[in-house]
C-alpha cells in the first residue's frame, strides 16, 4: 500500500469515528463492559441492598429522555467512595459512597449525577474523541515516520486514549444539572447533591485514601458545588414543596449494610477505572 493510500484510509477512518454512535451500539458497548466489570468487582448480591438501589435508580432514570434504556444499577462491595456509569444505562455505586450519604436525597443526588452522564452520553463522546486522537496519532506516524515500531505506536495510542478517561468540568457541570432535574422529577429534593459533594470534598482534605478514586474521574472544586447550590436556590420554592428529603426505607438500607460483613480494604489498583472502556471486539 502506498503512503498516499494509507493517508487516505486514515482520513476516512477519522471521518468514520466522527459519526454518531447509535443507541444499539452504545448499549452493546455498555453490556460488554458491564460483563467485564461484574466479573472483576465484588457486586453485592444481598437482595435488600441490590433491590433498593435498583428501584431507586430506575425510578429516577424513568423520568429522563432515555427512559427506554434497560437501566441496571449495581452496588460494589468496596469501602472506597466511588460511582461510575457505563454507556447504555449501567450504573455502579460503591458501598463506601452509600455509607457517606446521611439522607435519601444525598444518595439520590449521587445516583442522579451518574444517570446524567448516561443521558448526556458523556462516555460515548469520550470514546469518540479517543478514537479521533488515535487516528490522528496514526496519521502523524504515517506522514512523519516518527513511529517506526509497533511498540511506539501502541504507547502513543494508549497515551492518547488516557487523555479522555477523566470527565471534563463541563461534563460534570452538565451531570450536576441533570441530577437536579432528575431528582425533582422523581419526587426527591435536590438539595442533597451539594451537601454530599461538600462532605466528600472535606473528607478528601483529611483522609483522601478511600475517596481519591471518586475524584480521579469526577473533577470537583468548591466552585462547582457552589454552582449547583446556587442553581437549586434559584428554583421557585413551590417547585421544592412536597419533595422528599429522607424516608424510612433509606435508613433500612443503611442498617442492613451495617449488619453485613465489612469489605476488605482493597489496593487502589484493584478498582476498575470508570474511563477504561472498550468497544465490542
Task: Give a label for each model feature.
Residues 1-4:
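N-terminal secretory signal peptides that target proteins for export/translocation
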Amino acid at each position: 500500500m502506498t503512503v498516499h493510500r494509507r493517508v487516505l484510509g486514515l482520513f476516512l477512518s477519522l471521518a468514520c469515528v466522527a459519526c454518531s454512535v447509535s443507541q444499539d451500539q452504545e448499549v452493546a458497548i455498555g453490556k460488554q463492559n458491564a460483563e467485564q466489570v461484574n466479573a472483576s468487582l465484588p457486586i453485592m448480591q444481598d437482595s435488600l441492598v441490590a433491590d433498593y438501589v435498583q428501584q431507586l435508580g430506575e425510578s429516577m432514570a424513568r423520568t429522563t429522555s432515555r427512559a427506554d434504556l434497560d437501566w441496571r444499577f449495581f452496588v460494589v462491595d468496596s469501602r472506597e467512595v466511588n460511582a461510575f456509569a457505563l454507556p447504555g444505562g449501567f450504573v455502579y455505586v460503591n458501598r463506601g459512597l452509600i455509607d457517606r450519604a446521611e439522607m435519601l436525597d444525598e444518595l439520590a443526588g449521587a445516583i442522579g449525577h451518574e444517570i446524567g452522564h448516561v443521558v448526556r452520553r458523556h462516555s460515548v463522546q469520550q470514546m469518540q474523541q479517543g478514537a479521533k486522537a488515535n487516528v490522528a496519532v496514526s496519521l502523524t506516524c504515517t506522514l512523519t515516520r516518527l513511529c517506526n515500531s509497533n511498540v511506539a505506536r501502541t504507547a502513543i495510542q494508549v497515551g492518547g486514549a488516557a487523555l479522555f478517561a477523566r470527565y471534563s468540568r463541563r461534563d460534570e457541570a452538565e451531570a450536576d444539572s441533570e441530577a437536579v432535574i432528575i431528582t425533582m422529577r422523581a419526587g426527591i429534593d435536590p438539595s442533597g447533591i451539594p451537601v454530599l459533594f461538600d462532605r466528600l470534598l472535606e473528607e478528601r482534605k483529611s483522609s483522601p485514601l478511600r475517596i481519591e478514586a471518586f475524584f480521579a474521574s469526577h473533577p470537583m472544586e468548591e466552585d462547582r458545588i457552589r454552582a449547583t447550590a446556587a442553581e437549586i436556590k434559584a428554583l421557585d420554592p413551590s417547585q421544592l414543596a412536597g419533595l422528599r428529603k429522607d424516608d424510612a426505607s433509606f435508613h433500612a438500607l443503611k442498617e442492613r449494610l451495617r449488619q453485613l460483613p465489612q469489605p476488605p480494604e482493597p489496593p487502589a489498583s484493584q478498582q476498575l477505572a470508570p474511563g477504561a472502556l472498550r468497544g465490542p471486539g
